[in-house]
From Swiss-Prot:
The lineage of its organism: Eukaryota, Metazoa, Chordata, Craniata, Vertebrata. Gene3D superfamilies: Homeodomain-like (1.10.10.60). This is Homeobox protein Hox-C11a. Sequence-specific transcription factor which is part of a developmental regulatory system that provides cells with specific positional identities on the anterior-posterior axis. The keyword Transcription applies.
Length: 322
C-alpha cells in the first residue's frame, strides 16, 4: 500500500512536469501507460485535467472553430434518430411523415398489413379524381401499391384488374365481395331464365335438401315429380315463371329448420317413410311448423334417400371385394 502512495505522488509529479514541458502535445499524455506506476483512484481525482485550460497555451487550428455540431457516428450506425438519417434525408421533400414512418419501420408480417398501411397515405395524394358518389370499397387498398412504388412496376398489371377506374362510366363499378368479387352489371336479366331453366333439373336430381324454404319447395313440386299437384297448378306455375322471366326475380328469404325440428323429423322418417295426415298434423303442432312444411320436408327426404341408395349401390357394385 505504501508503494502505491509513493508511486502515486511520483505519477503526479511526472504529470506536472510533462504538462509544463510538453504543453503543445497534451493529447498524447493521456495515452501513455506506465507499468511501474500503480493507478490509485483517489489520487486521480485530485489531479487537474489534461485538456488545455485558459492559462495553457492556445493552439491555432488550421480550420475554423465555429463549425456546426456533427452528429456522432454511433447514432447514425445504430439508427437512434431515424428521422435525421443521412440516407433518408433526400426523401423528406417527397414524402409525408407517415410515409417515412412506414419506410423506417420493419416490414409487416403480411402483404395485407403493408397494403392497409399505405392506403391512408395514398388516398390523400391520388384520390382527388374519384366521384363522391361512387362505391369504392377497396380502390385505395389495391391501387396504393402499384402507384407509390412500394412494389416494382412489374406488379402493376396485377393491381389494374382488381379495381375500376370509374372515370369513363360511373355505373360500371366493381363491387368486390368476400366470396368472389362478382361484378354487378346490366347482364342480370339474361341470367334469370338460365337460373329458372336449371330449377326443374335440380328438382329432379337433387330436390332432397333438408333446408328448403316453402317457396322454393313449391316451385319444385310444381315443376315435376310430384303426383299430388294438379295440371291446373302446373299451368299456373308455368305462367308465373313466364311472368317472372320478364321482371327480375327476388328470392325469398330462406328459413332453415332448427336442429330440434330436424331431429324430430328424422326420427319420424326412420319409422315411417310415408307419413299420414294425422301424424303430419301432430308433428306440425309439436314443431311449430305448417302442415305444408312437414309434407314437403318428407318429400325432399324421400328424394334424398333415393339418391343415397343409388349412390350406395353404385359404390358397392364398383368394388368387387365388397
Amino acid at each position: 500500500m505504501f508503494n502505491s502512495v509513493n508511486l502515486g505522488n511520483f505519477c503526479s509529479q511526472t504529470r506536472k512536469d510533462r504538462t509544463s514541458e510538453f504543453g503543445d502535445r497534451t493529447g498524447c499524455a493521456s495515452n501513455i501507460y506506465l507499468p511501474s506506476c500503480t493507478y490509485y483512484v483517489p489520487e486521480f481525482s485530485a489531479v487537474s485535467s489534461f485538456l488545455p485550460q485558459a492559462t495553457s497555451r492556445q493552439i491555432s487550428y488550421p480550420y475554423s472553430t465555429n463549425l456546426s455540431q456533427v452528429q456522432p457516428v454511433r447514432d447514425v450506425s445504430y439508427g437512434l434518430d431515424p428521422a435525421s438519417k443521412w440516407h433518408r434525408s433526400n426523401y423528406a421533400s417527397c414524402y409525408s411523415g407517415e410515409d417515412l414512418v412506414h419506410r423506417d419501420c420493419l416490414p409487416p408480417s403480411t402483404m395485407t398489413e403493408m397494403l392497409m398501411k399505405n392506403e391512408s397515405v395514398y388516398s390523400h395524394h391520388h384520390h382527388h379524381h374519384t366521384h363522391p358518389g361512387s362505391n369504392h370499397p377497396s380502390a385505395g387498398f389495391y391501387s396504393g401499391v402499384g402507384k407509390n412504388n412500394v412494389l416494382p412496376q412489374g406488379f402493376d398489371r396485377f393491381f389494374e384488374t382488381a379495381y375500376c377506374s370509374s372515370t369513363d362510366n360511373q355505373s360500371d363499378i366493381c363491387l368486390q365481395k368476400g366470396e368472389g368479387g362478382k361484378q354487378e352489371s346490366d347482364s342480370q336479366q339474361p341470367q334469370q331464365p338460365q337460373q329458372q331453366r336449371q330449377q326443374p333439373s335440380a328438382a329432379l336430381a337433387g330436390a332432397s335438401e333438408q333446408e328448403k324454404d316453402p317457396g322454393d319447395e313449391e316451385e319444385q313440386t310444381n315443376s315435376g315429380s310430384c303426383s299430388t299437384s294438379s295440371p291446373a297448378a302446373t299451368k299456373e306455375g308455368n305462367a308465373g315463371k313466364s311472368s317472372h322471366s320478364s321482371t327480375p326475380r327476388t328470392r325469398k328469404k330462406r328459413c332453415p329448420y332448427s336442429k330440434f325440428q330436424i331431429r324430430e323429423l328424422e326420427r319420424e322418417f326412420f319409422f315411417n317413410v310415408y307419413i299420414n295426415k294425422e301424424k303430419r298434423l301432430q308433428l306440425s303442432r309439436m314443431l311449430n311448423l305448417t302442415d305444408r312444411q312437414v309434407k314437403i320436408w318428407f318429400q325432399n327426404r324421400r328424394m334424398k334417400e333415393k339418391k343415397l341408395s343409388r349412390d350406395r349401390l353404385q359404390y358397392f357394385s364398383g368394388n368387387p371385394l365388397l
